[in-house]
Amino acid sequence: MTKTSKLDALRAATSREDLAKILDVKLVFLTNVLYRIGSDNQYTQFTIPKKGKGVRTISAPTDRLKDIQRRICDLLSDCRDEIFAIRKISNNYSFGFERGKSIILNAYKHRGKQIILNIDLKDFFESFNFGRVRGYFLSNQDFLLNPVVATTLAKAACYNGTLPQGSPCSPIISNLICNIMDMRLAKLAKKYGCTYSRYADDITISTNKNTFPLEMATVQPEGVVLGKVLVKEIENSGFEINDSKTRLTYKTSRQEVTGLTVNRIVNIDRCYYKKTRALAHALYRTGEYKVPDENGVLVSGGLDKLEGMFGFIDQVDKFNNIKKKLNKQPDRYVLTNATLHGFKLKLNAREKAYSKFIYYKFFHGNTCPTIITEGKTDRIYLKAALHSLETSYPELFREKTDSKKKEINLNIFKSNEKTKYFLDLSGGTADLKKFVERYKNNYASYYGSVPKQPVIMVLDNDTGPSDLLNFLRNKVKSCPDDVTEMRKMKYIHVFYNLYIVLTPLSPSGEQTSMEDLFPKDILDIKIDGKKFNKNNDGDSKTEYGKHIFSMRVVRDKKRKIDFKAFCCIFDAIKDIKEHYKLMLNS
């Protein structure tokens, strides 16, 4: 089904079966999840502290329900794009959880303004009850859905009768329903020389006038009083204003839009960056950092939370760099200094702090063994092999937090443009040699803290790592002084928590690569009449290379492949885990 036909298909649907086809799920799955088990029985609730006082309740759906909700989100997003195209509407007002929109773009719309009005909608998602959601799909002129279809969509979207925070489809449904309000408020703002935008429950209206239009808001002794017309439009749209969060700010003071300062450029509040850096410093020194929970009690924070904070700061910096035409992609990821630590010269202070955290997450504070490979195809091989051999290596798996299913308990490092920029690590033995050369300096930068898990480089036993092995022979006292001996070892302990595993030499002593661990009948598989050549990275008229082999043979046919030759790698990983555990306890 093409993208442009989805709205018509949804309008034409008259049954759950029709809806299931549009969502590309089986009817029995849709019915079982929504009705037999019951959508209300498939949520886990937890709270997170709000920026100010109080807590925010998150309702996280199960994987099965989340899958349906994501499909509904994609469907409704496509329908909305089609509606806007038909009606020639440009969505310049709603920025929350929208395709191509962000919290930064929302703030950017109000940068450098004289006066900014911030309005908060009270209990935003709770304002969308089951009847309101169902009624929208039934009566809105853009949809006019069949009652069965409208009811099923509302059933999938709502929890305890309202849209929950935590569902993938809550944002798109709320934005659809808010569309009329957005257009009316934008028109009202424009009438009085103001700019309007909304990010979920945060409404922002700004102006370059020296005084804010009286029709929009005034400052009274008791505080900011919103104009009657403005209040009427919001309340008629089914929302209540949280008066305690209404505020007017002027250019002479700090102006914020959805948590970002906008006086001159869009920026992170300095206190936020200092807090993030301080939390990271505590993590490096003690192995943990503390944040207050919903009751104000200090509890240990996770790596993901801190990474989110650093990532948000970097996202804002990158946005400003692009706007200033500095470090514009792809130039941002091009290194100009080839010395060992030269890549850091391109990083500003914030980026250096983020770089240090990323390194810590993967190689010093890693909560499970980190596996580094030479390239992306090796990652695919190892994952497919380990899943196939799961019963033989239960210690290399863990239960998922939200289900009884198992997942690999190894962090198989994925290199990309981001890791190249922040870590100078994008795969290939040249990068890995520099990684080892820098390891001691990086290790020392975490104030003597000791990693709890090993870092394991899994490499081909061919000419690729020759320079690295020669470096170990000449510069690392703990390693053998004979490269030939190293090539025969089950694993090499370099120093600290760093190890190397090489593919085993052939029975005749010849060098090998990871592809040599596959059975001959798998290596002989032809794709489109072409033979596999492990030394061919491209795709010629007669041969195909590693990428196609990894995707169309290993990934697509993994259930039919005998991966027993990979046991040598996983046995080595098991032994390394035990070796490092003994080191920590000695």
Swiss-Prot record:
Disulfide linkage: none
Molecular functions per Gene Ontology: metal ion binding; RNA binding; RNA-directed DNA polymerase activity; RNA-DNA hybrid ribonuclease activity
Residues forming coiled coils: none
EC number of the protein: 2.7.7.49, 3.1.26.4
Domain of life: Bacteria
Stretches assigned to the Reverse transcriptase domain: 29-262
Binding residue positions for Mg(2+): 120, 201-202
Keyword presence, NADP: no
UniProt xrefs under Pfam families: RVT_1
Known catalytic reactions: DNA(n) + a 2'-deoxyribonucleoside 5'-triphosphate = DNA(n+1) + diphosphate; Endonucleolytic cleavage to 5'-phosphomonoester
Keyword Oxidoreductase: no
UniProt cross-references to InterPro entries, sorted A to Z: Bacterial_RT, DNA/RNA_pol_sf, GrpII_Intron_Splice-Mob/Def, Reverse_transcriptase_msDNA, RT_dom
GO annotation terms (biological process): defense response to virus
KO phenotype (gene knockout): No synthesis of msDNA.
Free-text comment on this protein's domains from its UniProt entry: The N-terminus is the reverse transcriptase, the C-terminus (downstream of residue 430) is also required for msDNA synthesis. The C-terminus was originally suggested to have RNase H activity, but may have another nuclease activity instead.
UniProt similarity note: Belongs to the bacterial reverse transcriptase family.
Further facts: Retrons may be the ancestors of retrovirus.
Protein's name according to its UniProt entry: Retron Ec67 protein
Species in which this protein is naturally found: Escherichia coli
Gene: ret
